[in-house]
UniProtKB/Swiss-Prot annotation:
It comes from Homo sapiens (Human). This is Lamin tail domain-containing protein 2. Pfam families: LTD. The gene is LMNTD2. Residues 276-287 have a biased composition (Low complexity). Residues 502-513 have a biased composition (Basic residues). One of its GO terms (cellular component) is lamin filament. Residues 322-337, 540-550 have a biased composition (Basic and acidic residues).
Length: 634
């Protein structure tokens, strides 16, 4: 039938835009289809048939329902064409044919954007958490790296100290303190140096080796109790002064060991200090002449009281007059090894009348041939004396025999003194003769022998003369192994001895103590033990056993008592000492700082033998290094 043809076309339109029609279950419209006006762009199909025989009522319900849907679709198409135009309609048809998704509305686009924002926020949160975790991980790694770096720095510092100590052991970088007992203590120069005391206009020496800047002088004082002493205050001060904090500075120094005990003096600049200075050997080979080999040390501590210092000087000059009267030839080109150590002064009121006044105030206060030292004192209360270029000269019958020139930069603090040490010049077994041309002239206190202190211009600043006196050859460590510094007198010689022990009894008790308790320690073929009383008196009985009945042997003296202890009895006067010497021996009191020793510190290597045997076959107990001129028993 003709009227069914447009219906097939409309069914195609319904399939194309079926979503615009009513639902499938909608009831059919009751009105009959009529001819629609031609309002659409295309010619509308004519539903009515010219054949009157055909009526709509005669159609079945299904056909009517299809016709109704076709009309609805036409109405919707007309409305859409009116709203959007022909082009929009064609675009929509093309999109539907191509299967493209329909255009989203503003609501759907906003929802999509919100979903995207939420996704981005979630991703940012995850990235933030990941970054926080990475930050914590990096901080932990940084902390571990910092700890590892600190451990490596500590290990490096320990290695530096160990290397410095090993260098001090194997060379003359550090100073070696050796006593007659075989004890050896190595103290490096850097350990006793405090850079805070260096003056601004004085440059610190550029020595080789490691610099240790973290030096605590209180710990140094506890570490080296034998290097620091404090004399008893004067009678004007009733209460003792507290132990001062040792705040000193010193240059680095190093000496080089050469054959036949030759030491080349190598100096650095010394700081100008009002309190004290300390140091060791320094590397400056140009500061010493090659003709004056030596091993020089500069050690110092705060000034002591006038009275205590004068007592010490009087004890040295009175009780040990036999030694102090001997002329010391300060330096020997082959064996001389002077050691320079500034120390607190001696009282100028008790100086010998033979001492001369000098424009600079420097004075030679003591010369000992037996102990081989010359002591120079700076009596000034404020000014620091400059010893640079000054010369110590010893004349015998008007001819120079010994010569020592102070290195550049040598400063002497006010109320301090320096001690120039020399080694033995001849063997104890085979004394040298004065006529020998190949060996140094033996140290003899002969008439006309004088010790002069000359300025760099040659002016005589101080002169010290001693009457003629023959002295025996040095008997203790004449082979050059006794290298001690003038630093401390010890009340006791043993390493673990009690410093507050009362003085030893007279000769009868000492003889019993020497002969009875030490018999078990003898070895076959060794001689009897002697007490370590003096480096100069120790081997007086070298040719045979002890002879207590021999009146030529001087009576031993007791070590000074501890100051501030009224319970300790004063030593009794002995037969060989005068009243003046006994009085000086009682007044000479020393305070020694002895505290706990930090053995973990690698700055000091202290090796103490149980027993030590000298080249003469004698054995003596082990003790810490002592200075023979200030801590002698005889």
């Amino acid at each position: 039938m003709r009227w069914l043809r447009p219906a097939g076309r409309r069914r195609e339109q319904e399939s194309v835009s079926g979503h615009l029609g009513p639902p499938a279950g909608a009831p059919a419209a009751p009105e009959t289809p009529t001819c629609l006006p031609d309002t659409t762009p295309h010619p509308a199909p004519v539903v009515c048939s010219a054949d009157p025989q055909l009526a709509l009522e005669s159609l079945d319900p299904r056909t009517l329902r299809l016709l109704w849907r076709q009309r609805e679709l036409e109405i919707q198409a007309l409305r859409w064409a009116i709203q959007n135009g022909e082009d929009a309609r064609l675009c929509h048809i093309l999109e539907e044919v191509a299967g493209l998704p329909p255009k989203r509305s503003s609501h759907s686009q906003e929802k999509l954007l919100q979903n995207q924002v939420q996704k981005l926020i979630q991703e940012l949160k995850e990235q933030k958490e990941r970054a926080q975790w990475e930050k914590e991980h990096l901080e932990e790694r940084l902390l571990q790296t910092t700890r590892t770096l600190q451990e490596m720095e500590a290990e490096l510092q320990n290695l530096q100290k160990s290397c410095l100590l090993q260098l001090a052991r194997s060379s003359w970088v550090g100073r070696m303190l050796r006593s007659q007992t075989g004890s050896v203590e190595v103290v490096t120069a850097e350990t006793l140096m405090d850079p805070s005391d260096l003056s601004e206009n004085i440059q610190a020496p550029t020595g080789e080796g490691f610099r240790l800047e973290d030096v605590d002088w209180n710990s140094v004082a506890r570490r080296y109790p034998n290097l620091f002493t404090n004399m008893e205050p004067s009678s004007k001060q009733k209460q003792p002064r507290p132990w001062p904090q040792l705040d000193t500075g010193s240059p680095e120094s190093s000496g080089k060991h050469s054959e036949r005990h030759h030491k080349t003096v190598e100096w650095g600049s010394l700081p100008c200090l009002n309190t004290s200075s300390s140091g060791g050997a320094d590397s400056d080979s140009s500061s010493c002449r090659p003709g004056l080999p030596s091993f020089v040390q500069v050690i110092g501590h705060p000034p002591r009281d006038h009275r205590a210092s004068s007592e010490q000087a009087l004890v040295q000059a009175g009780s040990y007059s036999r030694d102090s009267e001997d002329l010391q030839k300060t330096h020997s080109p082959r064996h001389g090894e002077p050691v320079l150590s500034p120390q607190p002064c001696t009282d100028p009121d008790h100086w010998s009348p033979e001492l001369l006044q000098s424009p600079t105030g420097l004075k030679i206060v003591a010369v000992s041939c037996r102990e081989k030292f010359v002591r120079i004192f700076n009596p000034s209360q404020e000014s620091t004396a400059d010893l640079s270029g000054m010369v110590l000269k010893q004349l015998v019958r008007g001819f120079p025999e010994r010569l020592y020139r102070f290195p550049p930069g040598t400063l002497l603090a006010p109320r301090h003194h320096v001690t120039v040490w020399g080694e033995a010049t001849r063997s104890a077994k085979k004394p040298l003769r004065a006529s020998s041309s190949r060996e140094p002239v033996p140290l003899l206190s002969i008439r006309g022998c004088a010790t002069l202190l000359l300025s760099p211009k040659g002016e005589v600043l101080s002169e010290h003369r001693i009457p003629r006196r023959e002295t025996p050859a040095p008997r203790v460590f004449a082979d050059g192994t006794d290298l001690s510094i003038d630093r401390f007198p010890l009340p006791e010689a043993g390493p673990g001895a009690d410093t507050r022990k009362p003085p030893r009894p007279p000769r009868p008790l000492r003889k019993g103590r020497v002969r009875e308790p030490r018999v078990s320690r003898r070895r076959p073929g060794t001689r009897g033990l002697l007490p370590p009383v003096s480096s100069g008196k120790l081997f007086h009985a070298r040719e045979g056993p002890a002879r207590p009945e021999n009146p030529e042997i001087p009576a031993p003296q007791h070590l000074p008592a501890i100051p501030g202890d009224p319970t300790l009895p004063s030593p009794p006067a002995e037969a060989g000492l005068g009243l003046e010497d006994c009085r000086l021996q009682k007044e000479h009191r020393v305070r020694v700082c002895r505290k706990s020793v930090d053995r973990s510190c690698p700055l000091v290597a202290l090796s103490v033998q149980n027993t030590a045997e000298s080249r003469f076959g004698f054995r003596f107990l082990s003790c810490l290094p002592v200075t023979a001129d200030t801590c002698r028993g005889a």
